[in-house]
Amino acid sequence: GYIYIEGVKNMPVYLFSVDGKLLHFAENVNGSYSIPAENGVHLIKIGNTSYKIINF
């Protein structure tokens, strides 16, 4: 599946597994962005804000 992000304005985006492993990084994301990701629980950091998400 994918994780979709919208409304980001020139911010870094990090995707982590729940055990802290960096799965994806993108610099200066602007507008809409999608990240391929397996189903399950992930942590995503956009700029200085972190979110816990479930991808299914």
Regions found by a protein language model. Give the residues of each.
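C-terminal outer-membrane/trafficking sorting elements
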Residues: 1-56
